[in-house]
Amino acid sequence: MSNEYVIGIDLGTTYSCLAYIDEEGDPIVEKNFEQEDTTPSVILFNENGEIIVGSPAKDMAIMYPMERVVTAIKRQIGTDYEVDIDGDKYTPITLSAAILRKMINDFNDNHGVEVKRAVITCPAYFGQTERDATKTAGKVAGLEDVTIINEPTAAAISFGFGAGAGEKKRVMVYDLGGGTFDVTVLDIDGSAFTAVATDGERLLGGKDWDQVLIKIIKQKVCEENDIEESELEDDDDVKQSLILDSETIKKRLSSAESTKGTLTVGG
């Protein structure tokens, strides 16, 4: 039964998602162990040598030094970036594999299978090095057959932009994610999708909005409490709190013009 399912994985900068096609031919987003549709792309190395991935890692991040928490590893895929944890070195491939493995294991546990085949999405502008690294991460995570598909193509298929037999169309896909931004023009001929042009900024996404909010929060905290910004910079707990809270604040500001929050400094 290992080949009963072929899964699709959106390996994202800030959140990742897994889906499959059910017996009726409908796409189903798989819930992880925490009963969430998406898994935070966060990795925590605790003091016992455990590698924790997803919401538990994100929730506990504030309790650990920043160097034991890895986020946005997708931005480093295909590079020689390394993380040293207790003398062990982890690459973007092995770190990405940890995220993939968590989602795959949750799927296997939910369905009582051992899935070995998957389609993993990547930005259209990824070169061969990044694509190969993503595929290798899938293999390290336990997959045997990994296919890489461009994110704009996956989005077009998902939203039903396919053309009928003999029909042609051109669409533009705007993809603003947690860590990357790109716009791709696709030519669709029946079931064939061809990227005509793509451009964007690989270091622009939701996390950068978070960083702007962090800067604003720091300024306001310092102004209203007559403290130096260096006091915030030297406090790891404050920095971790700002990283976590900025995302929550950003979400609130998506539907409100203002919001409030708390920040404990030196307490």
Describe every region a protein language model picked out.
Residues 1-79, 83-85, 89, 105-267:
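Oxyanion-binding/catalytic loops of NTP- or PPi-dependent enzymes
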Residues 88-98:
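Conserved AMP-binding/adenylate-forming core of the ANL superfamily
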Residues 97-107:
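Short, well-ordered amphipathic alpha-helical segments that serve as non-catalytic structural scaffolds
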